[in-house]
């Protein structure tokens, strides 16, 4: 194993370290630190200002509320586009590797890079949307966010005539 040193003094960490874990992610490793800042959790107040989030495919999230503020709608086309482009590139890599042979496809460095890029783009999109939702809730003093249970989600989705892209 390689010895890696990380200077915690250089980072603005405030609080007591409770847990540290290393998580593999594609060809890299992530360091997750859990800190205790010593602050008590805020007490629950009267729940009166509620927003509801409806997750979807064409519309990634539709957000409404009970206080009369205009609703939010986040389109999901960007995620569909990212997935479509990733599937196209993976299909090409798979085709080149398995052309003229009976060997099964094995993940290569190039395939890992394509998947990593896709996952990073999706994570970036999700992070930005979550940040916008939280900021909107704070701005409008929303105290409760409700996200429905999505049992059987996407079962009635029309994925098209040909669906052979994993």
Model-derived regions, located:
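Acidic carboxylate diad motif detector
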Residues: 1-23
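Positively charged, helix-rich recognition surfaces that bind polyanionic ligands
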Residues: 25-166
């Amino acid at each position: 194993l390689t010895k890696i040193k990380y200077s915690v003094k250089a980072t603005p960490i405030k609080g007591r370290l409770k847990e540290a874990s290393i998580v593999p992610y594609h060809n890299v490793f992530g360091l997750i630190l859990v800190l205790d800042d010593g602050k008590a959790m805020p007490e629950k107040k009267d729940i009166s200002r509620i927003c509801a989030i409806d997750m979807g495919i064409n519309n990634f999230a539709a957000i409404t509320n009970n206080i009369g503020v205009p609703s939010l709608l986040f389109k999901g086309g960007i995620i569909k586009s990212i997935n479509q482009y990733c599937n196209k590139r993976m299909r090409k890599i798979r085709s080149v590797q398995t052309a003229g042979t009976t060997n099964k496809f094995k993940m290569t460095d190039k395939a890992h890079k394509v998947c990593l890029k896709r996952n990073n783009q999706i994570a970036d999109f999700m992070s930005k949307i979550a940040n916008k939702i939280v900021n909107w809730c704070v701005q409008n003093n929303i105290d409760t966010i409700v996200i429905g249970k999505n049992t059987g989600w996407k079962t009635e989705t029309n994925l098209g005539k040909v669906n052979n892209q994993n």
